């Protein structure tokens, strides 16, 4: 079970949002590269970066901070990035800088042809982020709810050749209210590619519950507010996951 610390970038700083609201952000660090190093030192095997300004602007906005993170830890662990990635040139630029995975969210839903092209050009490097509320997919930094069912889109994108899917329950993100295990497992069981859980991770019980369903296809979990607030000790949680799932 991969526990993947999230580093959300806003104006070059590491922040956390509550339910995706840019106006409800807390700055946790003004040095994202040092933050990345600290998670690696605590045993992280992958990092999850989000360019928040980019997600809302539709183009990269925190590239300098991202490249500093990649220079600091990119040669040691896999790094994945989402937010504002809407064209092949941006993907190529980030992969050349040492990024392992690019996460495509809104653009995958609105422009499936772009996702197909990305999977063809950069096979093995493309992850889709599906954000949903009550089983329906949301786009545009969670501001728009679509009529698409998560499982239907998951199957479609799997056929395109995406590496894995990050499933975020946006009703729970940043609320420390517990992962929506049931919905995550439902998606994982419907697919043959791995699913990464996200949104609401709060404590060690969540980690243990996720380890119980790893064999259903749940590969990992994005760790956000809980590891920054101290509700979850990251190093202890990763050690527990390794103990449970070897």
Swiss-Prot record:
Keywords: Amino-acid biosynthesis, Cytoplasm, Histidine biosynthesis, Isomerase. It is an enzyme of class 5 (isomerase). InterPro entries: Aldolase_TIM (IPR013785), His_biosynth (IPR006062), HisA_bact_arch (IPR006063), Isoase_HisA-like (IPR044524), Isoase_HisA-like_bact (IPR023016), RibuloseP-bd_barrel (IPR011060). It catalyses: 1-(5-phospho-beta-D-ribosyl)-5-[(5-phospho-beta-D-ribosylamino)methylideneamino]imidazole-4-carboxamide = 5-[(5-phospho-1-deoxy-D-ribulos-1-ylimino)methylamino]-1-(5-phospho-beta-D-ribosyl)imidazole-4-carboxamide. Pfam families: His_biosynth. Gene3D superfamilies: Aldolase class I. One of its GO terms (biological process) is L-tryptophan biosynthetic process. GO terms for molecular function: 1-(5-phosphoribosyl)-5-[(5-phosphoribosylamino)methylideneamino]imidazole-4-carboxamide isomerase activity. One of its GO terms (cellular component) is cytoplasm. It comes from the Bacteria. It is found in: Cytoplasm. The active site is at residues 8, 131. Pathway: Amino-acid biosynthesis; L-histidine biosynthesis; L-histidine from 5-phospho-alpha-D-ribose 1-diphosphate: step 4/9. Its EC number is 5.3.1.16. Belongs to the HisA/HisF family. This is 1-(5-phosphoribosyl)-5-[(5-phosphoribosylamino)methylideneamino] imidazole-4-carboxamide isomerase.
């Amino acid at each position: 079970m991969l526990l993947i610390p999230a580093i959300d970038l806003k104006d070059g700083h590491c922040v956390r949002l509550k339910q995706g609201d840019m106006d409800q952000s807390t700055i946790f660090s003004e040095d994202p590269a040092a933050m990345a190093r600290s998670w690696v030192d605590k045993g992280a095997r992958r990092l999850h970066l989000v360019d928040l300004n980019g997600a809302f602007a539709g183009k990269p906005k925190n590239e300098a901070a991202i490249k500093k993170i990649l220079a600091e830890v990119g040669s040691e662990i896999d790094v994945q990035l989402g937010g504002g990635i809407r064209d092949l040139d941006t993907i190529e630029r980030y992969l050349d800088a040492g990024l392992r995975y690019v996460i495509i969210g809104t653009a995958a839903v609105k422009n499936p042809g772009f996702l197909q092209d990305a999977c063809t050009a950069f096979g093995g490097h493309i992850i889709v982020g599906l954000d949903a509320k009550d089983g329906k997919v949301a786009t545009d930094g969670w501001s728009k709810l679509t009529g698409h069912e998560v499982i239907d889109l998951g199957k479609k994108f799997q056929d395109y050749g995406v590496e894995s899917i990050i499933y975020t329950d946006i009703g729970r993100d940043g609320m420390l209210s517990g992962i929506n295990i049931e919905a995550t497992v439902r998606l994982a069981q419907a697919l043959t590619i791995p699913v990464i859980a996200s949104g609401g991770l709060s404590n060690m019980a969540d980690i243990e519950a996720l380890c119980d369903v790893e064999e259903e296809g749940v590969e990992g979990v994005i760790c956000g507010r809980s590891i920054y607030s101290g509700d979850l000790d990251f190093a202890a949680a990763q050690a527990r996951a390794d103990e449970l799932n070897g």
